[in-house]
Amino acid sequence: MRKVFIPLLASVPALSVAFLATLAPTSVRAVPSYARQTGLPCSGCHYTPPELNPAGRKFKLLGYVDKDKERPGLEIKDESKSHHAGLDLLSSLPFSAMFETSLATTKTPQPGTQNGNFEFPQDVSVFLAGAWADHVGSFLQVTYNAQDDHFSIDNTDIRYAKTRKVGGKDLVYGVNLNNNPGVEDLWNSTPAWGFPWIASDSAPTPTAAPIIAGPLAQDVAGIGGYAMWGDHLYVDGAIYRSDHVGNPQPNSGSGLGYNIRGVAPYWRVAWQQLTPKAQYELGAYGMHMASTPGAVVGLEDKYTDTAVDFQVDRTLFRKDVLSLRGTYIRENSTLAATFAAMGAQVSSHHLDTIFTNAEYHFGNRLSGTVGWFDTGGTVDPLLYAQSAVSGSANGNPRGAGYIGNFSFFPMQNIQLGVQYTGYTRFNGAAINYDGAGRNASGNNTWYLLARFIF
């Protein structure tokens, strides 16, 4: 799993981060160590991996600590009584591993490169995923990526959670440590855990993306608190600092597109309604960040993201599930630092991003998904500069298209997937978008994946 944050040189605008970082493969998994801990199959918490069902959302909310009652924690005996050790260790440590191999081909080869990229592996991951103690658990992933040829920390979510009664209803509350804004979320409608579930790491992707939709992933460290009241109202808040893993510490900011000044606050609120055959969620989330690109002092670029999202899961024909999801993100930014460095033609910018998708789960073995995405915003020939394949001839950040995915799970820990991504706009145009003769449709991508997790 490659990181979705792409470090930028100080002279490169901070907004020039791959838009499809938001469409890159995310780290959410049906991790077998959870199944071993709870005694449940993967379908106990997922419609089809990685989409969480109500039980899966509850398991995450409670800090990944629920256990099979037939497999108690480690007991220490003395002459007078038996009692649970304070660490409540499992009979086996909560480790899992994953192997992915893939084949990707674009309609038009990238200049000077071969088409049909076969990666064996694309990613190899190890997970520490499960209960650490009575109220503490984690989803922690370390990934080797063949493109980077090294291991790195991937999406990580460590929780402390408890429950009490408030107003006659259950209040679940907790503290969360994570490295990606939104990674703590319970639904699959927001960018951190959103569709597509798989994607090529070699195919071209559009340039522009809101900061809340991928550019900060695995490049920040955050702490926050969350609560769910009555299985209806969910609130979450966190603050983030830059954490440039793999770079010298203390941080100098050199060569990095985002260096958070102070802290960057993140907020989330959602309402869910549960019925015997359907679950509904409607929410909002956002983030504010001040950053000094390429340094830790000086003029600042400021970003404010505000978003709304929804998710509907409806059971059909007893075992099938239809899922509808979507989010709209508005980003307003003032790029004083980038403008002063002549990296932008104007200082005030905005981006508007929409992701929507519909998925049909045929039991827990097959799923088909169709998604649509669209990002547009302020035209700026310096911020979105011209270059072959990755640039824009007109300075327009528009990127739009569709994704079709079909996944088959012959066993609960094996996924075979085929996916097609088509572009109607790429970096501002459909025809000759880069000024070098490449069309948006030239980046249309077929992608095949085999994933094994155990």
Q: What is the predicted function of each stretch?
A:
Residues A278-G404, F408, Y420:
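Detector for outer-membrane/organellar transmembrane beta-barrel domains
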Residues G39-P50:
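The canonical Cys-X-X-Cys-His
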Residues N53-P54, L90-T106, P111-V245, R261-K277, ...:
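Outer membrane beta-barrel
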Residues S102-P109, T143-Q147, K165, N180-E184, ...:
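Sequence/structural signature of outer-membrane beta-barrel proteins
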Residues P41, F408, I414, A440-F454:
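Outer-membrane beta-barrel "beta-signal"
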Residues P121-D123, F151-D157, D170-V172, V220-G222, ...:
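Transmembrane beta-barrel architecture of outer membranes
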